[in-house]
């Protein structure tokens, strides 16, 4: 399996393209000078295009992914607000954007050529939405609204239109600040990291995918931590055995084991990472974590112990300024 790692560095307006070896080493393939401050990224399900949200001219840049993993710009399209998080539906027909500062979410069609075009829908009235996450049925979009302490739920129809779900929202603890999400591969459980109180919530998903119920909340910080909690990102291994979160104040990755059915998390430990880890990801083999240090200007590579989930630091690599997003492609 050939794997390509994309790292977005907004302060230098660059995307660094790396090849990940089976041993966890990175080789730089390309440095892309981007048309703006590159922030969130998403890969098309068919692995032919990479989408990048940019500012200050709010928009999406579509890049064609070449056979070797390098990028060629294929198009640009506007967005209604500064893109905080982007994702696609599971079929690659629509791109969703959440704008924290714009208090909105939007839907943009993806053409047959893989290029994103202008939005067909904008949903206003969201307070600080931080991500847009399609559920395993591809029929429900979950939008954590950090300042509402709610995850808003929207039905997605075949024409790409979002409408409020019958369960309009899932409520978190007061002051939690829901931010990013991950799903178990069995489609029965979802996980949300909460930025402000430094916790992770586990939600049970009903059989038809129509209802989310909170079943567990766990602290992501060590017991002796007394600073300001500032959680950022969350990812689960492809086999569903281990889940990881990041905190930017302590600059740590927290390691959780996941019960076989996905319903219960247990803290395994904590691993130091690059300074201010706003974004990280797990490779498709489930063997490596790659974490970006927004203040260090580096990415760190960590090997996952397949029995415990604990991390071993392998290496660190310089990237651009303010790296904040990591996306990984398997070819």
Curated annotation (Swiss-Prot):
Q: Which domain of life is it from?
A: Bacteria
Q: Kindly list the organism's lineage.
A: Bacteria, Pseudomonadati, Pseudomonadota, Gammaproteobacteria, Enterobacterales
- Give yes or no: UniProt keyword Aminoacyl-tRNA synthetase: no
Role description:
Catalyzes the hydrolysis of 6-phosphogluconolactone to 6-phosphogluconate.
Reactions catalysed, semicolon-separated, are: 6-phospho-D-glucono-1,5-lactone + H2O = 6-phospho-D-gluconate + H(+)
UniProt enzyme class: hydrolase
- What are the UniProt keywords, alphabetically? Carbohydrate metabolism, Glucose metabolism, Hydrolase
Family to which the UniProt record says this protein belongs: Belongs to the cycloisomerase 2 family.
What is the protein name stated in its UniProt record? 6-phosphogluconolactonase
């Amino acid at each position: 399996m050939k794997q390509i790692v994309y790292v977005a560095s907004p302060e230098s307006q660059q995307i660094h393209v790396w090849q990940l070896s089976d041993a966890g080493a990175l080789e730089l393939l390309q440095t892309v000078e981007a048309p703006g401050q590159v922030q969130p990224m998403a890969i098309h399900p068919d692995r032919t295009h990479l989408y990048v949200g940019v500012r200050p001219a709010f928009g999406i840049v579509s890049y064609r992914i070449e056979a070797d993993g390098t990028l060629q710009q294929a198009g640009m399209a506007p967005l209604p607000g500064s893109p905080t998080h982007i994702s696609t539906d599971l079929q690659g027909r629509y791109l969703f954007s959440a704008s924290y500062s714009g208090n909105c979410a939007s839907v943009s069609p993806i053409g047959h050529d893989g290029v994103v075009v202008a939005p067909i829908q904008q949903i206003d009235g969201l307070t600080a939405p931080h991500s847009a996450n399609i559920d395993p049925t591809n029929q429900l979009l979950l939008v954590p609204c950090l300042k509402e302490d709610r995850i808003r739920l929207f039905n997605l129809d075949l024409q790409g239109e979002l409408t409020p779900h019958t369960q309009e929202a899932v409520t978190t603890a007061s002051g939690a600040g829901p931010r990013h999400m991950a799903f178990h591969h069995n489609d029965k459980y979802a996980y949300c990291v909460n930025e402000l109180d430094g916790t992770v919530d586990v939600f049970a998903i009903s059989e038809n995918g129509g209802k989310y119920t909170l079943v567990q909340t766990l602290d992501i910080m060590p017991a002796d931590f007394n600073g300001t909690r500032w959680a950022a990102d969350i990812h689960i291994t492809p086999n569903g055995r281990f889940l990881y979160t990041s905190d930017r104040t302590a600059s740590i990755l927290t390691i959780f084991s996941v019960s076989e059915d996905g319903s219960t998390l247990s803290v395994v430990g904590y691993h130091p990472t690059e300074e201010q880890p706003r974004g990280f990801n797990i490779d498709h083999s489930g063997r490596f974590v790659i974490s970006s240090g927004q203040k260090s200007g580096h990415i760190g590579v960590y090997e996952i112990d397949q029995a415990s989930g604990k991390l071993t630091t392998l290496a660190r690599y310089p990237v651009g300024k303010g790296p904040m997003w990591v996306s990984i492609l398997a070819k």
